[in-house]
Amino acid sequence: MEYIYAALLLHSAGKEITEDAIKAVLSAAGVEVDDARVKALVAGLEGVDIEEAIANAAMPVAAAPAAAAPAAAAEEKKEEEKKEEKKEEDTAAVAGLAALFG
């Protein structure tokens, strides 16, 4: 997370997000820098509008409760299917017994 925080700090300060800048922020914070992670972060942020990403990241949190409703409907369908299967099994069992005592 420190790497992302460093990038956000640079962005909020209006500085360019480069490998050297991220390394400087992390070093100033006393974090041991992993060059591979820094390179991956800079490459991943290339062409990304950070302001837009922050705004979009906040929106799904508010929409998350609405997503729970379809899941509940799916669970209800599964329960109904299980009940129907149980009824079919019971009917088959009764038919089998009737055949025995016919």
Curated annotation (Swiss-Prot):
A GO biological process held by the record: translational elongation
Keywords: Ribonucleoprotein, Ribosomal protein
GO cellular component: ribonucleoprotein complex; ribosome
Stretches with biased composition (Basic and acidic residues): 74-90
Stretch forming the signal peptide: none
A Pfam family per the record: Ribosomal_60s
Residues covered by region (Disordered): 69-91
InterPro entries xrefs: P1/P2_N_sf, Ribosomal_P1/P2, Ribosomal_P1_arc
Assembly behavior: Part of the 50S ribosomal subunit. Homodimer, it forms part of the ribosomal stalk which helps the ribosome interact with GTP-bound translation factors. Forms a heptameric uL10/P0(P1)2(P1)2(P1)2 complex, where uL10/P0 forms an elongated spine to which the P1 dimers bind in a sequential fashion.
Protein name: Large ribosomal subunit protein P1
Source species: Methanocaldococcus jannaschii (strain ATCC 43067 / DSM 2661 / JAL-1 / JCM 10045 / NBRC 100440)
